[in-house]
From Swiss-Prot:
It holds the Pfam family GlutR_dimer. It is an enzyme of class 1 (oxidoreductase). GO terms for biological process: protoporphyrinogen IX biosynthetic process from glutamate. It comes from the Bacteria. Catalyzes the NADPH-dependent reduction of glutamyl-tRNA(Glu) to glutamate 1-semialdehyde (GSA). This is Glutamyl-tRNA reductase. The active site is at residue 50. Possesses an unusual extended V-shaped dimeric structure with each monomer consisting of three distinct domains arranged along a curved 'spinal' alpha-helix. The N-terminal catalytic domain specifically recognizes the glutamate moiety of the substrate. The second domain is the NADPH-binding domain, and the third C-terminal domain is responsible for dimerization. The record marks 95 as: Important for activity. It comes from Acinetobacter baumannii (strain ATCC 17978 / DSM 105126 / CIP 53.77 / LMG 1025 / NCDC KC755 / 5377). During catalysis, the active site Cys acts as a nucleophile attacking the alpha-carbonyl group of tRNA-bound glutamate with the formation of a thioester intermediate between enzyme and glutamate, and the concomitant release of tRNA(Glu). The thioester intermediate is finally reduced by direct hydride transfer from NADPH, to form the product GSA. InterPro entries: 4pyrrol_synth_GluRdtase, 4pyrrol_synth_GluRdtase_dimer, 4pyrrol_synth_GluRdtase_N, GluRdtase_CS, GluRdtase_dimer_dom_sf, GluRdtase_N_sf, NAD(P)-bd_dom_sf, Shikm_DH/Glu-tRNA_Rdtase.
Length: 427
């Protein structure tokens, strides 16, 4: 039984193929619940995100995982075979650690993937498809991810617009829990801004959007994290003073936040500072507002230069993180080998004791029937020696016949070292 990782990601498969083999939690839970009754493949975890679908399992071969993935999604194996990657044992462990650490992500170092892998493990545990051995691999991968994030800078620099705005707000205002944020337009970019700031723990989110339906949708997505208020687009100017942070991305051909509106808002705020972020092209905010005392204005180019610099820093940190992951993977593999050796040694010792007990019983019976004690003991020693060294002798003969001279030489030298050690006089 080996540990396998098999799947597709944004590098190996198109979004159309990834959509075909994606799982939602409910469907995956039902599939796993059925799978635990199959002896051939009942020990598995499935990680499914927008950028990857991967199966991690203890199995006899990778082909069974590939077939399961295809069958579960009602597609032909031939559609997958040229797009999947597969890793076994050491490589699979290293891959899992890289995934959990964000080193294999589309956005290098992104933190969400660790939570997604943890959720995948929890779902499999609930379905009872996780053995202690598989669980220990995942727990060590989480430990590796924690080390990578705490000891390297791979995840410490903003590399998306939404995250960059949130980090900027944290730099300008030291206490996010007191902030009121206004997002002007609720499109994809500002939705990410709103979600990042909500996760950061701001006090209130004001959504100003032309379409009430889209504003309601965004409000529902973040309402569990932050107090939300929706205002009409026509009420934008008169509500500006309420916002500590304003992020605008309307797609309008004309500016929607005028210099005079910001000046009035500052006066109403008693000149408390404002962070204004203009993510639109053409620009939404009159660039002259930057001249107002207390206003910090950032545009797309400002943020992009920060993101480019941060991404370069992440890539540099990723080199250090890769070294750490390889070291931790080696540690886990060594630990597993030692554990396996312990089991083998225990079985070998038990086997030897059984042989000894049988030979002892045979010798005692010979003595009971009047056998010469000296002859019985000599026969006992000879028979015991022959049976104990037989497996090692056979192993050495087979190694000599094999096409790997290095293994034979290693085994021969190792046995010689054992003999030399035993011959040393005891003090």
């Amino acid at each position: 039984m080996s540990f396998f990782a098999l799947g597709v990601n944004h590098q190996t498969a198109s979004v159309e193929l990834r959509e075909q083999i994606a799982f939602n939690a409910e469907r995956l839970s039902n599939l796993l619940a059925e799978q635990r009754h199959h002896e051939s493949l009942k020990d598995l975890v499935v990680v499914s995100t927008c950028n990857r679908t991967e199966v991690y399992a203890m199995a006899e071969d990778a082909e069974s995982l590939l077939k399961w993935l295809a069958d579960a999604n009602n597609i032909d194996v031939k559609q997958l075979i040229h797009h999947v990657y597969r890793y076994e044992n050491a490589q699979a462990i290293t891959h899992l650690m890289r995934v959990a650490s964000g080193l294999d992500s589309l956005m290098l170092g992104e933190p969400q993937i660790l939570g997604q892998v943890k959720s995948a493990l929890a779902l499999s545990k609930e379905a009872q498809t996780v053995s202690p051995e598989l669980n220990s691999v995942f727990e060590y991968a989480f430990y590796a991810a924690k080390r990578v994030r705490s000891e390297t800078a791979v995840g410490s620099h903003a590399v998306s617009m939404g995250y960059a705005v949130a980090q900027l707000a944290l730099q300008v205002f030291s206490k996010p829990e007191k902030l009121t944020v206004m997002v002007v337009a609720a499109g994809e970019m500002n939705s990410l801004v709103a979600k990042h700031l909500a996760e950061m723990g701001v006090a209130k989110m004001i959504i100003c959007n032309r379409s009430r339906e889209r504003a309601d949708q965004l409000a529902q997505e973040i309402a569990h994290q932050v107090e939300v208020e929706i205002i009409d687009f026509s009420d934008l100017a008169e509500n500006l003073y309420r916002a500590d942070v304003v992020s605008s991305c309307t797609g309008s051909l004309h500016q929607v936040i005028a210099y005079a509106d910001v000046k009035t808002a500052l006066k109403k705020r008693r000149y408390q500072q404002m962070l204004m972020v203009d993510l639109a092209v053409p620009r939404d905010i009159d660039p002259k507002v930057e001249s107002l005392d207390g206003v910090y204005l950032y545009g797309v180019d400002d943020l992009q230069s920060v993101i480019d610099e941060n991404l370069a820093q992440r890539r540099q940190a990723a080199v250090e993180a890769e070294v750490m992951v390889n070291q931790l993977a080696t540690q886990l593999i060594t630990h597993q080998k030692v554990k396996e050796a312990g089991s083998t040694i225990h079985a070998y010792r038990q086997h030897s004791e059984e042989i000894s007990q049988r030979e002892l019983t045979h010798a005692l019976e010979a003595l009971h029937h009047g056998g010469n004690p000296e002859q019985v003991l000599q026969q006992f020693a000879h028979r015991l020696t022959q049976k104990l060294i037989h497996p090692t002798s056979m192993l050495l003969r087979e190694a000599a016949k094999a096409e790997s001279p290095d293994y034979f030489e290693w085994l021969q030298q190792h046995l010689q070292d054992v003999f030399d050690h035993e011959r040393k006089p005891k003090r």
